[in-house]
UniProtKB/Swiss-Prot annotation:
UniProt xrefs under Gene3D superfamilies: Chorismate synthase AroC
Protein name, per record: Chorismate synthase
Cofactor(s) essential for the protein: FMNH2
EC number: 4.2.3.5
Cofactor note: Reduced FMN (FMNH(2)).
BP GO annotations: amino acid biosynthetic process; aromatic amino acid family biosynthetic process; chorismate biosynthetic process
InterPro entries (UniProt xref): Chorismate_synth, Chorismate_synth_AroC_sf, Chorismate_synthase_CS
Function, in words: This reaction introduces a second double bond into the aromatic ring system.
Amino acid sequence: MRYTTAGESHGPEEIAVIEGIPAGLHITQEDVNAQLARRQKGYGRGERQKIETDTVTFLTGIRHQKTLGSPITLNVHNDDHNNWSKIMAPNEPQTSENSLRKVLRPRPGHADLVGGIKYRHHDDLRNVLERSSARETTMRVAVGAVAKKLLAEIGVDVHGFVVNVGPAKSDLSTLTQYQDLEALRQVTESFETRALDAAADKAIRDVIDSTKRDANTVGGQVQVMATGVPVGLGSYISADDKLDAKIARAIVGINAFKGVQFGGGFDNAEKYGDQVMDEIFWRPEKGFYRGSDNLGGFEGGMTTGEAIVVRGVVKPIPTLYRPMQSVDIDTHQDHRASIERSDTTAVTAAAVIAEAMVAIELAKAVLDKFDADNIDRMKEQVAAYRQEVKAF
């Protein structure tokens, strides 16, 4: 399985093409739209979300709600393009009229300046920010929706939530009270902040509100969990086959993510071995299992069968309504950075995007290990493999 996305933030369309999805997977546009709606929601989002109503169109690879095994093309229309059609026009030369929204003062923390240098966009840094914008993650969430449908066929569930926004934190000790991810999902999705509890929801709202009043932005952390994952996805044979490494790359590849950890993560660096390693047990009814999950579901780059636990660090959004020091790329004179429409925080949406990326990497790993031509054959192979693992 592989995919690619295309599209600019204020261009007419966002597009994704997915290859390698087995034939016979049942999927509807509503399945994808539900995930796109989750991405748009969240406390602290900006005015763009009031303009867009993200809905997907299936262009290729799906017939009668079933995948064909051929490339799947997904399309989401940018409603805001109506306000930018002249500025983003692909078939018109640049004029004074369609250059009104030039960006010449790069934002610290954004791709503006380095992207302009790299691609020689001397005249307008909008050529950078239109693609580097997090609007592109719309299509990663759409691809993730397809991946989640595939994973659900073999009993794998994936869910993301917010750990903290600034100093306001969810109470992670409450995670033990949930029987499964569906029960957890019902709680976190009931809050606009995607927090774990009502107290954290209120605290996070307060932080976001005060940050907005200060014309500032704020970061945080999100956590993604996956259950029902077969043992042995990934490999210890080569470094680039390690599944945790692939997931780490996928998480840090999301806009504004600056760190990732598995299980106990960086806290494990302050502990001793007998406090960290997940002891091994065996029971005839379930086979091998671990007594804890401090390593986040991975050993040697392979899944252990325990819950995958991944956390990502999200930096504050670089666009500030109280802009920071910058330099005009034309005059080289000091100026305040450009201002683009932005969110106070994207952490609430980041949980959904990170969830999608974990689902994509897990789906890739499943399709690497099992039959990728037909969904029923894949399910048969996974079921047989689970029995083999249990009997080991």
